[in-house]
């Protein structure tokens, strides 16, 4: 140890000892610390155990067996990494490297013999296995032990697998409604009950079990294949684009009621029929409408409610104008103040309706007429003075008291001024 330290210290400041005692330049040492080229060229099989310094010991005992790498390395401790080449660009982890030996590889599903192959699990559910065992027994009822025996005899996987699959068989028998437990008779030998298939689900369960048994697990079930190959018109529900005769009749009645009917006397009131149906109508009928559930009497009562509620057709025929003309006899009180009377917009579907004449002029015209009336009253008062002799009114003198003589004189002066005007 001391000799190696002295040998390292004996090298100059510009030199450094290499891994094999050689001398390297400082620049080369810096490049080796920052470069990752060694990682791509690294291989576990080619890696050698580090050499111990002279006089050193191996406290952990890693190098007692030659040719083995320290188990502290995660990749070296994995036996799956032995024999696997490590090339740049194709990393191999310890999880993906764990695979069965070549002799234990699973064969293709089409070539599997479940009776002799112990490495491939059958692609059947536990309920299907139970059903297959009951059907193979040719008896109306079967014991649990007989089900176990049939499964192990026909599937080699369950002979070598963990016996926990038997718990799954028992759970399926107890919880699945397709199986019924039959109690043992008193005079029958043995113990434990029997199991059989419920007749309500027997046909469906047996057909599904043996169809799966004949075909490999990767194939499509025959029932689904036949359903997919059928044409849409052959479907029992008629397909998404086919409409039965009853639905077509209902659709025709609906078009006649909405497209050609009117309010009460449709043709007499509106003057014409609709020539085009509604632009958006659904021709697909997925379920019968609610009108099928009504009796003929109820449908007769609902017939007067059918009508055309198209506002555009109503305004084209001028029906609203006739309705508004009937309002001319009504007297509408003007607003309390001119400010509260705003513009009334009677535009419906882009058509403007003029205000009735009884509604009165706008606020500005009413204000102008009010000013004109006040001016007219003032001028008429000046143009037509009081005629004391011609009028039957009493003279103003007796009305006023004795102290108001001056006021009566002033009134007479105003009357004389008005005569000149």
Curated annotation (Swiss-Prot):
Q: Which gene encodes it?
A: Foxj1
This entry carries the following GO cellular component terms, namely: nucleus
Localization, UniProt: Nucleus
Q: In which tissues is it expressed?
A: Predominantly expressed in tissues containing motile cilia.
GO MF annotations, alphabetized: DNA-binding transcription activator activity, RNA polymerase II-specific; RNA polymerase II cis-regulatory region sequence-specific DNA binding
Q: Which family does it belong to?
A: Belongs to the FOXJ1 family.
Where do the record's region annotations for Disordered lie?
1-32, 77-110
Q: What is the predominant subcellular site recorded for this chain?
A: nucleus
Biased composition regions of type Gly residues, renumbered to the chain: 11-21
Query: What InterPro entries would the database entry show?
Result: FH_FOXJ1, Fork_head_dom, FOXJ1, TF_fork_head_CS_1, TF_fork_head_CS_2, WH-like_DNA-bd_sf, WH_DNA-bd_sf
Q: What is this protein called?
A: Forkhead box protein J1
Reply yes or no: does the keyword DNA-binding apply: yes
- Provide the residue ranges listed under DNA-binding region in this record: 120-210
Compositionally biased intervals (Polar residues): 90-99
**What does a knockout show?**
Mice lack motile respiratory tract cilia and exhibit randomization of the left-right body axis due to loss of motile cilia in the embryonic node. Motile type cilia with a '9 + 2' microtubule ultrastructure are absent in epithelial cells, including those in the airways.
Looking up PROSITE patterns in the UniProt record yields: FORK_HEAD_1, FORK_HEAD_2, FORK_HEAD_3
Record the organism: Mus musculus (Mouse)
Recorded superkingdom: Eukaryota
Q: Supply one GO BP term.
A: metanephric part of ureteric bud development
Gene3D superfamilies named among the record's database cross-references: Winged helix-like DNA-binding domain superfamily/Winged helix DNA-binding domain
What is this protein's function? Transcription factor specifically required for the formation of motile cilia. Acts by activating transcription of genes that mediate assembly of motile cilia, such as CFAP157. Binds the DNA consensus sequences 5'-HWDTGTTTGTTTA-3' or 5'-KTTTGTTGTTKTW-3' (where H is not G, W is A or T, D is not C, and K is G or T). Activates the transcription of a variety of ciliary proteins in the developing brain and lung.
């Amino acid at each position: 140890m001391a000799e190696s330290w002295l040998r390292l210290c004996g090298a100059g400041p510009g030199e450094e000892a290499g891994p094999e005692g050689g001398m390297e330049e400082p620049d080369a040492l810096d490049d080796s610390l920052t470069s990752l080229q060694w990682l791509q060229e690294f291989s576990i099989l080619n890696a050698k155990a580090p050499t111990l310094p002279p006089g050193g010991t191996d406290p952990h005992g890693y190098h007692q067996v030659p040719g083995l790498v320290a188990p502290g390395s995660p990749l070296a401790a994995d036996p799956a990494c032995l024999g696997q080449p490590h090339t740049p660009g194709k990393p191999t982890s310890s999880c993906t490297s764990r695979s069965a030996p070549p002799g234990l590889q699973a064969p293709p599903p089409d070539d599997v013999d479940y009776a002799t192959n112990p490495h491939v699990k059958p692609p059947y559910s536990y309920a299907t296995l139970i059903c297959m065992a009951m059907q193979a027994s040719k008896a109306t009822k079967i014991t649990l032990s007989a089900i176990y025996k049939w499964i192990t005899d026909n599937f080699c996987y369950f002979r070598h697998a963990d016996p926990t699959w038997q718990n799954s068989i028992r759970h399926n028998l107890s919880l699945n409604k397709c199986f019924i437990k039959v109690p043992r008779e008193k005079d029958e030998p043995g113990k434990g009950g029997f199991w059989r298939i419920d007749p309500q689900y027997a046909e469906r369960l047996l057909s599904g079990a043996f169809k799966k048994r004949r075909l490999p697990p990767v194939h499509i079930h025959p029932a689904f294949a036949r359903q997919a190959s059928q044409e849409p018109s052959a479907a029992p529900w008629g397909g998404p684009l086919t409409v039965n005769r009853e639905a077509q009749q209902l659709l025709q009645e609906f078009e006649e009621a909405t497209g050609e009917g009117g309010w009460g006397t449709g043709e007499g009131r509106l003057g014409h029929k609709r020539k085009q149906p509604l632009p958006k109508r659904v021709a697909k009928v997925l379920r019968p409408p609610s009108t099928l559930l009504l009796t003929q009497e109820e449908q007769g009562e609902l017939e007067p409610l059918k009508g055309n509620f198209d506002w555009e057709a109503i305004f084209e025929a001028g029906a609203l104008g006739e309705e508004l003309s009937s309002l001319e006899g009504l007297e509408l009180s003007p607003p309390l103040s001119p400010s509260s009377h705003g513009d009334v917009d009677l535009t419906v579907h882009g058509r403007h309706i003029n205000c009735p004449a009884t509604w009165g002029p706008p606020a500005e015209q009413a204000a102008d007429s009010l000013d004109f009336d006040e001016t007219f009253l003032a001028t008429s008062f000046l143009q037509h003075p009081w005629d004391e002799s011609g009028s039957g009114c009493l003279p103003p003198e007796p009305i006023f008291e004795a102290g108001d003589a001056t006021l009566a004189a002033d009134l007479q002066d105003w009357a004389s001024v008005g005569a000149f005007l």
